[in-house]
Structures are given as structure tokens and as C-alpha cells.
Amino acid sequence: LSIGTRPDCLGEDVLTLLSELNTIKPVWVELGLQTIHADTAAYIRRGYPLSTFEAAVKNLHARNLEVIVHTILGLPGESSEQMLETINYLNCQPIQGIKLQLLHVLKGTDLADDYLAGKFQTLSREEYLDLLISCLEHLSPDLVIHRVTGDGPKNLLIAPLWSSAKRSVLNDLHHIMKVRNTWQGRLYKEDLYD
């Protein structure tokens, strides 16, 4: 059973119910973190501080519930270094999985308004693949990768349009990693995260 929720929606009653369900069937709880950076979190209106995420992960871990964390690569204003800081932070958390999502700009959103006003650019396919590979190289080899890209609804997608060719992006990822002779965890240094 996979349940996607916000860290600030995990009260004691919900945690108790999830623990009970976990005795019947394995439960994975998916939490949307997106980024560890407060300025970016405020811009995208995440709506809770990093400490709330940390408390939720701690509470889920204490109940032996598996945790998958959603991150977004390419958020406006974030550098590659900041995105890697989010990955390195997650290496220190008692989580079991990660979803690495590309930023999608969808029609009818404030993000779309900012994009169309030229306030930020989305990542090119090459930039995304380079950044994604760097994230994978730094990611603990013990974490299960549940997603490395996604595709927004085609009728709403403004940018990046290349992301709608999901299979091709995945094929390029596999090819580039093979050519570079790299893999998940290649640059992971466990002693940095203890």
C-alpha cells in the first residue's frame, strides 16, 4: 500500500492507523519534500518547515513504516549545488526510497505566469540528464529509486516540452551512464553523512 501525503498531515491518529495497516500489508508513505532550501520552499508554497518533514520521517521510522521522498530538480533559483545538498541531506535521513522529479510548468499556475514572464528557465534535456546523473552518483546505494523523471499532462504542459518523451529520456539516461561508466552511489561517501 503506497500512500502519498504531506508531512504536516501525519498526526498521531494517522500514524497509529498506518502502523496497524502495516501489520496486514506493507505500507510505503510518500512525502513531498521537493527541496531542503527554505527560500525555494516558500516560493513554491510548500507550506511547512524542514523541521516538520524531519519529525514526520522520525515518527514513521519509529513505527517501521517505509518512506519515499519526492524531490524536484530544476526549481527556480536553485543551483546544481543546492540540489545536491538536498540529495546529501536525504542520505542522512532514515528513508528507504526517493523520487527524483523534473520541474514541470503547467498551464494555469503561478509558476506558469512566472515562467512566461521570463523570471526563470527550465532545464534543457542535457542539463537535466547531467544533474540527474550527478544526483544519482551522490545518492546512497541503499536507497531505492522509484522515479527519475516524469511527464506532465500533455494538454497542460508548457515546459519543458522535451519531457513528454519520457521513454527517450530514460534511454538517454541509461546510455550516458553506461558511456560514463557510472552508477548510483559512485560518489557517495558514507562517512560524510554519519
Where would I find each of the regions flagged by the language model?
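Aromatic/hydrophobic pocket-lining residues that form the small-molecule binding cavity
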Residues: 53-54, 79, 83, 128, ...
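Short, hinge-like loop/turn segments at secondary-structure boundaries
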Residues: 19-21, 48, 86-87, 116-118, ...
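Catalytic cores of alpha/beta
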Residues: 12-18, 76-92, 155
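Auxiliary Fe-S-binding modules of radical SAM enzymes
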Residues: 91, 97, 105-194
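Conserved SAM/AdoMet-binding glycine-rich loop
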Residues: 1-48, 52-55, 61-62
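Hydrophobic faces of well-ordered beta-strands that scaffold small-molecule active sites
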Residues: 1-3, 27-31, 67-71, 96-100, ...
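Conserved strand-turn element in the central/C-terminal portion of the radical SAM core barrel
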Residues: 38, 60-82, 102-107, 114-122, ...
